[in-house]
Amino acid sequence: MAQANSRSRNSATISYPEKRRARVNLGKREVEILKTPYLLETQIESYRKFLQKDIAAEKREDNGLHAAFKSVFPITSYSGYAVLEYVGYSLGGESTLFDVEECKLRGLTYAAPLKVNMRLVIYDKEAPAGKKAIKDIKEQEVYMGEIPLMTETGSLVINGTERVVVSQLHRSPGVFFEHDKGKTHSSGKLLYSARVIPYRGSWLDFEFDPKDCLFVRIDRRRKLPATVILRALGYDTEQILDMFYKTNHFHLNQETVTLDLIPQRLRGELAVVEIKDKKGKVIVEANRRISARHIRLIEKAEINKLELPDDYLYGKVIGKTIIDKETGEIIAHANEEITAELLKNLRATKTASLDTLYINEIECGPYVSDTLRLDTTTNQLEALVEIYRIMRPGEPPTKEAAESLFENLFFSPERYSLSAVGRMKFNRRVGRKELTGLDVLSKEDIVDVLRVLVDIRDGKGDVDDIDHLGNRRIRSVGEMAENQFRVGLVRVERAVKDRLSLADVENLMPQDLVNAKPVSAAIKEFFGSSQLSQFMDQNNPLSEITHKRRVSALGPGGLTRERAGFEVRDVHVTHYGRVCPIETPEGPNIGLINSLAVFARANEYGFLETPYRKVVDRVVTDETEYLSAIEEGDYYIAQANTNVDEKGRLVDDLISCRYKGEFTLTTPDKINYMDVSPRQIVSVAAALIPFLEHDDANRALMGSNMQRQAVPTIRPETPLVGTGMERTVAVDSGVTVIAKRSGVIDSVDASRIVVRVDRKETEDDDDIGVDIYNLTKFTRSNQNTCINQHPIVEVGDKVQKGDVLADGPSTDIGELALGQNLLVAFMPWNGYNFEDSILISERLVEEDRFTTIHIQEFTCVARDTKLGPEEITSDIPNVGESALAKLDESGIVHIGAEVNAGDILVGKVTPKGETQLTPEEKLLRAIFGEKASDVKDTSLRVTPGITGTVIDVRIFTREGVKKDERTLEIEKAELSKVEKDLNDELRVREDALFENLEKLLTGRVAAGGPNKLAKGTKITKSYLADLPRQKWFEIRLQDDAATKRLEASHEHFKELRETRDAKLKDSRQKLTQGGDLAPGVIKIVKVYLAVKRRIQPGDKMAGRHGNKGVISTIVPIEDMPYLEDGTPVDIVLNPLGVPSRMNIGQVLETHLGWAAKGLGKKIGEMIEKGADAKELRKSLKPIYDLSKTQRFDLEALEDPEIVMLAKNLRKGVPISSPVFDGATEEEIKQLLKMADLPTSGQAALYDGRTGKKFDRSVTVGYMYMLKLNHLVDDKMHARSTGSYSLVTQQPLGGKAQFGGQRFGEMEVWALEAYGAAYTLQEMLTVKSDDVAGRTRMYKNIVDGDHRMDAGMPESFNVLVKEIRSLAIDIGLEND
């Protein structure tokens, strides 16, 4: 990736755009330890892992496509005699037929064919038992459909539109323990539950009921006692009790009961008897509660036997089954309560000892024992049958069916998988050391879950926090695509199994067994219509980047809006540095859709992690470490702005830090890590808001969301007050053109840049590299905004790898430029800025400051109809000459034509069925042989409300259909463009080749050659200059080594020409071949209109701080308030919009912007006075010295570069004030002072209409304003007559349908209240759905008679019909 590597340059060299215009950085922190990472990494990396495209088959890791194949293959037939194995796969042998741009134009998917190597092994059926003999092996490559490829900028082109697959934040697989917060039962008792969530397979839930019995649910079905599942696993009652309880051992004789005492277990009980030490001293009196102090005394006294009365045993539970040794009969079952009768029996059979369960209310409850009493099953088979009945109600259970069902639920890798993540989380939660293991559950797993759940109920351990980012993980494109692919493969598997079992499998090849349809269908469905595969937001570069970095909790396997509560949407402690707390949509999705923080990334398990600097013994090191939310909790982490001395030691005695999710103060020696950067916690969009720290969170949220809606203006202007992120965003978004290799600019024009690459960058010495960059010109984005690139370099400029060569939409010299810097005044102005309205100066319209270009695409399709083919032609019936004036002879509009609403863009006629002809028509036909009446006009016209210029026409013709003139013309133009590129490349390479040759030949001794070159003469430059260059190869030299080099050069020369010809042929074939259009389509014509939208009242504008408003009016320049020096302001905002909204950032931005502009003005004045480079350098130095850190090195620039820099600073010196580390009040005042402006930031203003001074001084300055994509032109709509709904005959609604305005229920009430009967009648009949009345009305008006006679509204007839359909006869009485 060009962009990915663009940062790896050492910072010593200053990039080309920075030399042209550098920012003064007002951040306080020393140089950033970690450069902002490549912003699209999540998407690109994830998809790269999925495809593993350029990795050899044997070296591929176990994820993505490879993993999906391995999990499904090998497929064995039911008999086991035939096996289909997977060997490896390859993606797209030759480079894909069309590149990204062509796919967009032709409406295709940018994809590569997937070919899979498969091996069919057939075993010999006649082989002796136990020995498998291979009879036959066949290997073949099988085509498995197309896999979409990702573009360089992390989007996918599906059916010609750019889409983005948004990452999903879902609950990680593993085991979770929670309680119901006391909501289930009226007593408010906490009911604990455990849930095992697999990556795929059945969910397993354990839960307590209000009586403290344990139950299990499988897949949220009816609950069963939890011990049923333990029995199904093969445990009996005794083993189950043994797993959950310790036992107390009692010795029985005929009179007494003696307990083997373990003192700890007495805690909290009532002493039944007095407990005395050896000397007879009483430690605990009878009927006293035994406390911890008593227990210490008992332990000290070393009492280990205790005689107890019989009734102490009553109610205790037997732990092990007691059998009569003589007869072998069972006297007492395990889990049976002891009664007086049972004790009598025991004594009668001379049982010497018994074990009871140690159950204690404080630390060991009777839950499992109680549950066993509820459990009606007694052995494994009964338990399995019980589970089968729940899972498959109504089916008769058999032993085999019950066993296989239970086996498949949790223990078969096909049906159940925890995945590596799930296993890691599971083992961690149940307290095991090793983090790997089987993907399926084991007996021990289920028992461990129950054990932890019982412990939590007993008060040991805590429940989990679902919203903790250690329990939620990111699923990116690659992983989701892999899952879909696997689903497709599983569908294929069933079919393959059936085919493998056929008798004639020996004659089949792998290709005959595998049907690729289900796989490609699954992939197509995912990329085309999944909830997370979204139409890319392409308003501006920022909205693209943000869309690709979005994280959604919605989507398949996620939450739904309706069910998501407040907790999920809230900002969680673990979001710090991982997910932005600010940027999220307003409305029903708030908090469910988030944005990744600037430095965040997903680790191998899919958990988000964020970088920290290591702190060792109070010293901050430059080493960074990424920590996930789980690991972070155990460390003390200091903030990024903690005070540090020169050596990196922490200075303060108490340091504010985070520990276990809480903010605390602690001593420096405890600190383990420190934040990398102050902007670590916010997302890209929020990091672009200067003085974010002074804005209220709600407004910052609006600010970051509105920046994404800014429309690219014609003349982008970078913000005077930025944050230093602007360059990063512009480069990473991929809208700019970036140098792939360093070199010198060979030629530049508006649509391409040719770079002669530096020698050191090319692999081959002879070969000189040429990079040709074709720029995108006036193309339509997904949001109909305009994508246009223009070069910023000049011929002869030296560029480094990674430098910006051309600006794209909304970028200015390689920096993001979403809006314009305007001179703003905060004051009321005649009520025109009431309620956030905005007042602007006519100057903004004149200077085209907010003029934007929108590109509309119109498509005309000619199809084959039943009555014959439609035809695209300029011969259209009943259309005047004037309407056809803008079309060419093929019936398609000229490029450059200006068209208005209703104009014809493409003339098209459709055959209509034979109709009964009137006598006149028959006559006409007889005379003229006129066929005008059997076609109707179905031309493509411009939709209402649009005027624009035609900028491009594209024509796609079906294979085998004759191409019209226009198509051939377009193809010719395209081909000449390609030819020009190839010729330029050839020219540059040949020049370099001959340059090398000249060095080789000059001064050598010749052995003969053209132009009568005598043997033994020395070759001179002048001789070579007179000789045509092709003839140089005919020179014969005496030096053998040199001759060899000459021959090699000749070969190379021929090779270059051949390569050019081959490429040209390839392009010609690609251009002239017909498109594979949809069935029944003959021709498609796409016309692109450019619409220029100037700013006007009703358009929505906003600043970067959530200060939005609608333009109320545009005031002439002479009426605007003006400053003392006569400068009129550009825009007037209402000061009341600031205090209640608490976005003070805009005021600070205004002050700093004014200072920046003032400094620029001073530099401009110096240039006008003719200052030289030395003076300019001297005056620029104090400005750039304001940077405490990351100081721009003026010394590195040469004099011409200094002059160029100064010229670019005339409009204002750009300043960066990073988020949470911005300029202070003192610095702003200092800058204002340097610019000779009042340090208060306020100035006296004069009224433009009267010339009088306003009473108070007004806050004036430069603010960066954006024009948002909510334009009044797109919203305003009017209709006189138009289309009607079929059934009700009422006008349609909405702008898209060219509908009318609804006159609703409440409006009817209003007219009724006025008693305006006639108006009301008109509204409800002729203006709505009285069909007959409408036509009569029209007739009357034509006749000059303005009366109205209303008829029957159609909706009344619909009502009558509906009542009749209920078998009620209803009709109107005729008077």
UniProtKB/Swiss-Prot annotation:
Family stated for the protein in its record: Belongs to the RNA polymerase beta chain family.
A GO CC annotation given for this chain: DNA-directed RNA polymerase complex
InterPro entries registered for this protein in UniProt: DNA-dir_RNA_pol_bsu_ext_1_sf, DNA-dir_RNA_pol_bsu_external_1, DNA-dir_RNA_pol_su2, DNA-dir_RNAP_su2_dom, DNA-dir_RNAP_su2_hyb_sf, RNA_pol_bsu_bac, RNA_pol_bsu_CS, RNA_pol_bsu_protrusion
Domain of life: Bacteria
This protein's name: DNA-directed RNA polymerase subunit beta
Known catalytic reactions: RNA(n) + a ribonucleoside 5'-triphosphate = RNA(n+1) + diphosphate
GO biological process, one term: DNA-templated transcription
Main function: DNA-dependent RNA polymerase catalyzes the transcription of DNA into RNA using the four ribonucleoside triphosphates as substrates.
Annotated Pfam families: RNA_pol_Rpb2_1 (PF04563), RNA_pol_Rpb2_2 (PF04561), RNA_pol_Rpb2_3 (PF04565), RNA_pol_Rpb2_45 (PF10385), RNA_pol_Rpb2_6 (PF00562), RNA_pol_Rpb2_7 (PF04560)
HAMAP family assigned to the protein according to its UniProt record, in alphabetical order: RNApol_bact_RpoB (MF_01321)
NCBIfam families linked to this entry: PRK00405.1, rpoB
Coiled-coil boundaries: none
Oligomeric form and interacting partners: The RNAP catalytic core consists of 2 alpha, 1 beta, 1 beta' and 1 omega subunit. When a sigma factor is associated with the core the holoenzyme is formed, which can initiate transcription.
Enzyme Commission designation: 2.7.7.6
GO function terms (MF aspect): DNA binding; DNA-directed RNA polymerase activity; ribonucleoside binding
